[in-house]
Amino acid sequence: MTQAAAPAAHSSFYMAMRILPATRREAMFALYGFCRAVDDIADERGPATASQRLAELDRWRADVAGMFAGRAPTRLAALDQARRDFDLKQKDLDAVIDGMAMDAAEDIRAPDWATLDLYCDRVASAVGRLSVRIFGLAPEPGDALAHHLGRALQLTNILRDIDEDAAAGRLYLPREALAAAGVT
């Protein structure tokens, strides 16, 4: 198992990623490792305070910028190879960090639809845009697939995790939908 594969080994995605051709597989392992690392910062496994979590996400943002400037830090070596092999976009990696920052800054409670859509784009559709490049889809249909599938999967996750999120002080259901259902 490669170093990039290690974080994915305990994921439900691991077996699916293993069947990809080697270059695509290593790129997906690297992308998964990046997403897992920044997600861990934003949730309960991350630093204790919001300011500490945001500072750590800023370090990741600086490392991503350095990678695109030709100065990839060691922790992004595998992702840098994926970036070069598959033309991954900095804006999508930054969007993932921005989504985690939305979680890290404060507990999300009943955002409006626009904020929820932005959150879904950042934490799910951006990952989809990176993934479809690795899978080799053409940009236009690939980005459309990432847009819709990312949102569908993230909304499904929100519904699946509603109890867990509530225990953590988070509520991702949009306030307009709650109001329409008579929930205040």
Could you describe each region identified by the protein language model?
Residues M1-T184:
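Acidic catalytic motifs of isoprenoid enzymes
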